């Protein structure tokens, strides 16, 4: 059986089953949320851009927001036979990519994304078992559905496993 590597774009999500991998690139202030079910060997990955959809009148893409994308990813995994109680999470991203002297104008979107993702996963009762968040480096995230291992390629640092 040939394994494939499925790509998840910005403000997108997808699922793969073993022995496939799923990846996303360009995690700056964005966050990659990797959900994994050891029993079914199903892996889900979401690439969120913003913390909270309630600040917007028209939400055309729920996958852009932590508060909407995480429940949507869980529902898609449950539709494939996962039980939410078996899911574990690993997260990466949330960097401060720009240094502004006055962060009050834009806020620290990376930090707000981290907080929103942790809040949403906590509300869903999904444990975060590993994370690589914050800092000021971009990341690529690869989730292996065979064993749930996450490999990060961090700009200027190298490869880190979660």
UniProtKB/Swiss-Prot annotation:
InterPro entries: CheD-like_sf (IPR038592), Chemorcpt_Glu_NH3ase_CheD (IPR005659), Cytotoxic_necrot_fac-like_cat (IPR011324). Pfam families: CheD. It comes from the Bacteria. One of its GO terms (molecular function) is protein-glutamine glutaminase activity. It is an enzyme of class 3 (hydrolase). It catalyses: L-glutaminyl-[protein] + H2O = L-glutamyl-[protein] + NH4(+). Transmembrane segments: none annotated. Its EC number is 3.5.1.44. Disulfide bonds: none annotated. Keywords: Chemotaxis, Hydrolase. GO terms for biological process: chemotaxis. PANTHER family: CHEMORECEPTOR GLUTAMINE DEAMIDASE CHED-RELATED (PTHR35147:SF1). Belongs to the CheD family. Probably deamidates glutamine residues to glutamate on methyl-accepting chemotaxis receptors (MCPs), playing an important role in chemotaxis. This is Probable chemoreceptor glutamine deamidase CheD. It comes from Clostridium botulinum (strain Eklund 17B / Type B). The lineage of its organism: Bacteria, Bacillati, Bacillota, Clostridia, Eubacteriales.
């Amino acid at each position: 059986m040939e394994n494939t590597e499925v790509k998840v774009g910005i403000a997108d999500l997808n699922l793969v089953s073993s022995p496939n991998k799923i990846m996303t690139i360009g995690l700056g202030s964005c966050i990659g949320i990797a959900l994994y079910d050891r029993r079914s060997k199903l892996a889900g990955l979401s690439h969120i851009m913003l913390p909270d959809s309630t600040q917007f009148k028209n939400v055309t893409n729920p996958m852009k927001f932590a508060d909407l994308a995480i429940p949507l990813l869980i529902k898609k995994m449950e539709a494939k036979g996962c039980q939410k109680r078996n899911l574990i999470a690993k997260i990466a991203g949330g960097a401060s990519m720009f240094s502004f002297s006055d962060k009050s104008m834009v806020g620290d979107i990376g930090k707000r994304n981290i907080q929103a993702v942790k809040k949403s996963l906590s509300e869903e009762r999904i444990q975060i078992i590993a994370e690589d968040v914050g800092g000021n480096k971009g990341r690529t995230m690869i989730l292996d559905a065979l064993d749930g291992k996450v490999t990060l390629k961090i700009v200027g640092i190298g490869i880190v496993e979660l």
